[in-house]
UniProtKB/Swiss-Prot annotation:
Domain of life of the organism encoding this protein: Bacteria
Source species of the chain: Streptococcus thermophilus (strain ATCC BAA-491 / LMD-9)
Annotated S-S bridges: none
Record family assignment: Belongs to the UPF0297 family.
InterPro entries: IreB
Transmembrane segments: none
Name of the protein this chain belongs to: UPF0297 protein STER_1937
Length: 88
């Protein structure tokens, strides 16, 4: 599949946004409980897609794999922008 010069729309429904946020929080806690640096591990997963960055502990690996990585990135960007005063 090739690239286009046309702008493409990407939409994520509101229900998924809340679920992704909750999942990231749960995964973060599971990683911290196991002694990992949660931010580094989540970034490793998002960039590579390799689920080995997230442990099976507390079902964290299965939870995060329910979502496409682009959906996770969208939620992270939205959260960051809202936290910095951007009106979305």
């Amino acid at each position: 599949m090739g690239f286009t010069d046309e702008t493409v729309r990407f939409n994520l429904n509101d229900g998924d946004k809340n679920e992704i946020s909750n999942t990231l929080t749960n995964v973060y806690r599971s990683l911290a409980e196991k002694g990992y640096n949660p931010i580094n591990q989540i970034v490793g997963y998002v960039l590579s897609g390799d689920p080995a960055y997230v442990p099976r502990y507390n079902d964290a690996r299965n939870q995060i794999r329910k979502y496409e990585r682009d959906e996770i990135v969208e939620e992270l960007v939205r959260y960051y922008l809202k936290g910095n005063g951007t009106d979305l």
